[in-house]
Amino acid sequence: MRRAGAIAAFLILAAATVSVAPQPVLAPLAAPEPAPAKAIPSLGQVHRVFVIVMENLGYRAAMAVPALRSLAERYASASQYYATTHPSLPNYISLTSGGTYGITTDCWYCQLAVPNLGQELSAQGITWGAYMQGLPAACWLGPWWPPGDYAGKHDPFRYYTDIVTSPALCQHIQPLRALRARLAGPPSAVPRFVWITPNLCNDGHDCPAVQAAAWLAGEVAAITASPAWKDGGFLVVTWDEGNGADRRGVDAAGQVVPTGGGGHVLTLVISPLVTPGLVIATPLDHLSLLKTVEEIFNLPKLGATGQASVADFSAFLKPPH
């Protein structure tokens, strides 16, 4: 049984898409950056979180790609991290809401009226941005954009009704190019939570893993060169799901089980606050990543992340001075 099974389902299926009229690329950040209270001292060192989600690659296959193995050896990694389920979309939903809420396909028309990460970050005054490579304009909500190789099923934020029906919240969904200038500026120019979805080639969905790894290495280099990352940055790279035949996952007791999950995937932790080369073997999954973000920013727990059996990423961090 997956952890998501412990959550009540609140799925609303819409019969049509939300309006997809392009809007200007503009997402002003709030000037102040409040320092939230932290319940876990090691996580309290983190000032800014970056998350990159790649596509469809099992752990063993990922570690066989030289560029990915190099990143794992240079930074830190989780050797027992598991996706939620198959196919893609419910993994993205669990990463941002703590459950799958009845979604079992890559439906482009689904809408969810459930608490979610974007909503909670905004409610707490935490700046955030969801950056989608290939997205034609801010708050563009169409299911596909072939010229940019963009797929809406890899943007979880477009599925939450409170985000897509709010002009202010929807403006947090941005083309990836909008992040470039921010990274070149001071830390305050970059949102405190940054989500990055590559296009269908660079995430490895439609192109070879070697090509996706080359893109990822370049993106990691750009982020780690930025003042924002150097100032207590915490970058996590994970894969939405593993090999389709791999059904391993983490159950409600926090143990690895052979069925009910989305497979064994590589997860990288890249931060100046982490010991290089560290490998953590604690069973972790997408709920663990969401729980870690919640604890860093002192957010209410979403879905199943409130369960004590869900481990977080605090073991990756050096003890605070």
Task: Tell where the protein language model's regions lie, with residue ranges.
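N-terminal pro-sequences and low-complexity stem/linker regions of secreted or lumenal proteins
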Residues: 25-321
